[in-house]
């Protein structure tokens, strides 16, 4: 992949991603107590805005930060600012007097979160060789998934004592992340930079195929929006499960999802992005639909299986975005990947809340799962074509050696 120093840097980026994701997912198991009970909210749709406005900031700023970073040729300063700003804004959420103020603060917090996250992703692509994007994204994906897996149950446990505790702990952890960034993360000289923000916005026009991994990023994050908002509310409202146990149910999905990120990313480097992406998407869609049908305690089994097949999707889709982007647009490409992912993440909770309010939780998860399956079927032929071209290219390279 890289030299040993490159490995160390990628692992450091994975650790920072873990800290970031751990911190921002602490609050999810206690949304009922922190949002619904604190501000007397009864609608699932209105409650979902707590997550949706945060992710709306991701949508607006992910591509902007990637482009500015490429243009300046710097990553570290943006990652550091993202951690620090997120720490301050997360603490400020505990002081919000009204729901309206809370939503404004959540939006600003999202600006800093995506600043750190999108540039952590771009930094991995700066280090790894193109043939090892899958492994690089796998390491980053493990950091993200383990952060989610540990943040959710821990947030549920401490949130059962006081729903403000997850925010206090999250703010403190983000300060730790900022300290590690300032001390240990090196500023690398980028090989090239984007010419302008206009170039970033025209990236899809220049390389139309990059829309494929972007679409998978959208739908994968779309379903995650259901898991972080609608799923814990379903457990609390429909099944009467407490916040501590809600975190454990979320962990049943996230642990296998985390453990399999790196090995499946490495497999996609060897066999190609397309096979695991197609198979993972179809099976994952079925698993998501099943979440709304199967009741506890068997729901744990569905969550575990969902985590296994879900891990097939993320590394190859993120790596495919890196494969299709030219060197000058790596940061911009991953900013676009995050942009579409954030669109899905922002839309998921709101659409899930609307459907659940009107038709119930079972229909809500059916919408999420079918969305994944439909995207896989729409792009099936395009992915097969990409796979054929890659196989032919690899064969020609092998014959020329």
Task: Please give the residue ranges for each predicted region.
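Helix-breaking motifs and short loop linkers at transmembrane-helix boundaries and internal kinks
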Residues: 73, 95-97, 240, 272, ...
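Residue-level signature of mid-helix packing/kink "hotspots" within the transmembrane helices
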Residues: 55-63, 148-149, 254-262, 345-346
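Structural signature of the two symmetry-related core transmembrane helices
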Residues: 77-91, 275-289
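Short amphipathic helix-loop junctions that connect adjacent transmembrane helices
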Residues: 30-44, 229-244
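Interfacial helix-cap and linker-helix signal at transmembrane-aqueous boundaries
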Residues: 35-36, 68-69, 154-160, 235-236, ...
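Cytoplasmic helix-loop-helix junction between adjacent transmembrane helices
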Residues: 107-143, 319-320, 324
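Juxtamembrane intracellular "pre-TM" segments in multi-pass secondary transporters
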Residues: 1-7, 187-216, 395-401
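Symmetry-related core transmembrane helices of the 12-TM Major Facilitator Superfamily/SLC fold
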Residues: 166-182, 365-381
């Amino acid at each position: 992949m890289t030299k040993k120093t490159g490995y160390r840097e990628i692992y450091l980026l994975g650790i920072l991603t873990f800290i970031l994701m751990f911190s921002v997912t602490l609050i999810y198991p206690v949304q009922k107590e922190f949002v619904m009970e604190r501000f007397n909210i009864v609608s699932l749709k209105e409650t979902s805005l707590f997550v949706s406005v945060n992710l709306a900031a991701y949508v607006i700023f992910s591509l902007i930060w990637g482009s500015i970073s490429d243009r300046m040729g710097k990553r570290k300063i943006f990652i550091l600012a993202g951690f620090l700003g997120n720490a301050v804004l997360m603490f400020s959420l505990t002081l919000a007097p009204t729901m309206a103020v809370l939503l404004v603060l959540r939006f600003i917090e999202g600006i800093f979160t995506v600043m750190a996250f999108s540039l952590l992703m771009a930094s991995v692509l700066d280090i790894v060789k193109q043939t090892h994007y899958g492994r690089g994204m796998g390491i980053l994906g493990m950091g993200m998934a383990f952060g989610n897996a540990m943040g959710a149950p821990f947030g549920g446990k401490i949130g059962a004592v006081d729903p403000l505790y997850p925010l206090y702990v999250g703010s403190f952890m983000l300060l730790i992340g900022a300290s590690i960034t300032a001390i240990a993360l090196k500023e690398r000289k980028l090989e090239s930079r984007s010419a302008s923000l206009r170039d970033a916005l025209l990236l899809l026009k220049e390389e139309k195929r990059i829309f494929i991994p972007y679409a998978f990023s959208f739908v994968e994050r779309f379903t995650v929006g259901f898991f972080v908002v609608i799923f814990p509310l379903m457990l609390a409202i429909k099944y009467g499960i407490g916040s501590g146990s809600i975190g454990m149910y979320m962990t049943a999905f996230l642990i296998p999802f985390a453990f399999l990120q790196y090995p499946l990313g490495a497999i996609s480097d060897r066999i190609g992005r397309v096979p695991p992406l197609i198979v993972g998407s179809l099976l994952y869609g079925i698993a998501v639909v099943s979440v709304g049908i199967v009741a506890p305690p068997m729901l744990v089994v569905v969550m575990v299986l969902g985590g296994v097949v879900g891990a097939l999707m993320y590394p190859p889709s993120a790596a495919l975005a890196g494969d299709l982007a030219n060197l000058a647009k790596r940061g911009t490409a991953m900013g676009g990947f995050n942009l579409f992912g954030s669109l899905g993440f922002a839309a998921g909770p709101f659409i899930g809340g609307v459907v659940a309010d009107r038709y119930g939780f079972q229909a809500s998860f059916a919408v999420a799962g079918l969305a994944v399956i439909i995207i896989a079927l729409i792009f099936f032929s395009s992915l097969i074509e990409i796979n054929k071209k890659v196989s032919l290219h690899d064969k020609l390279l092998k014959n020329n050696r």
